[in-house]
Amino acid sequence: MDFESFFKNELDGLHQEGRYRVFADLARHRGSFPKATRYTADGAQEVTVWCSNDYLGMGQCPIVTEAMKNAIDECGAGAGGTRNISGTNHYHVLLERELADLHGKESALLFTSGYVSNWAALGTLCSKIPGVIVFSDAGNHASMIEGIRHSKCERVIFKHNSVADLEAKLAAADPRAPKIIAFESVYSMDGDIAPIREFCDLADKYGAMTYLDEVHAVGMYGPRGGGIAEREGLMHRLTVIEGTLGKAFGVMGGYITGSAALCDFIRSFASGFIFTTALPPALAAGALASIRHLKESQVERFAHQERVRRLRSLLDQRGIPHMVNPSHIVPVIVGDAAKCKWISDLLLDNFGIYVQPINYPTVPKKTERLRITPTPMHSDADIDHLVSALHSLWSRCALARAVA
């Protein structure tokens, strides 16, 4: 087989469909977020970033960066091993305690990313529990899907956020089989929120475990930043709450929280935890500082919500089509892969606005979009400039002014 030709042909297909991903070469500057410098073959350009998952700008917060610098001075750079073989630093232990407290659980377990935490935890639960059936929301993240698929357990996909469809599928399943209901709180592409209470009611009725991914909600919602489940007073009803340290907390890593026995079970059987080097102590120290701060401070969350409201209001005034949802994610619908990429390129090249186009397979075809994520650091002028640029490009492209 001519492997090189195969690789190139596959890539050519992505180019032709407008789905080839181009990474923006950015240098973020401490203290000036969301501004950054973009590097191209033509030189450097100052841009405003509108698609960061550092939702609250905590990755630039002096509380976090100072904690990380101090940890490097104290501990050095790397963890030095797996968690089992000399790699457990005291910062890991403190961070796991803080995460367990955040979600009202007995225990927590750190992973190297949110992807790995989902893949390893779900893969282990679904492969080790005899005869388990996992009921997975159709909108679940790739990390959850891959973990479930890797386990080779029986899986049932229910319609996205549909309480009725989930109940129908639970009722049709073997009543003797152990069951797991796996879903997210805030879905990253549409920004919609799961009916957590109703799913917990079904879990109680049918004797199922619940597995909730809160990666786009931790730090953002609830009086202490514990996510949607904390805001709704439902943390105690969930078996596993999974989250990330790389979005609102501004650092890197993933985790699960649950009972002491469950976390110890994952710790002892999950290959994605056992056979990898632990997070550097500085990352754990930064995440610890970020979580402690956001447990006490509402300033960042309130400012963030105000920025989201202002952006949505101005988009409405200009007739720019965005999906209405109850979260902080603002999807502006284009509906065509090539046009979505073209608009993103024009925003970057002509207006200094960086918004990454979101195309298939991340979202279904004909729903291509710009996924905009305001932060507390975006000024009124930043928002005005973005909306004005979108208005200009929508007119040039003769795009629809409403979400179908």
Curated annotation (Swiss-Prot):
Cofactor dependency: pyridoxal 5'-phosphate
Enzyme class: transferase
Active site: K247
Keywords tagged on the record: Acyltransferase, Heme biosynthesis, Pyridoxal phosphate, Transferase
Gene3D superfamilies in UniProt: Aspartate Aminotransferase, domain 1, Type I PLP-dependent aspartate aminotransferase-like (Major domain)
Name of this chain's protein: 5-aminolevulinate synthase
Family stated for the protein in its record: Belongs to the class-II pyridoxal-phosphate-dependent aminotransferase family.
Any GO BP: protoporphyrinogen IX biosynthetic process
Keyword Protein transport annotated: no
Domain of life per record: Bacteria
Highest classification ranks of the organism: Bacteria, Pseudomonadati, Pseudomonadota, Alphaproteobacteria, Hyphomicrobiales
Positions of substrate binding: R21, S136, T362
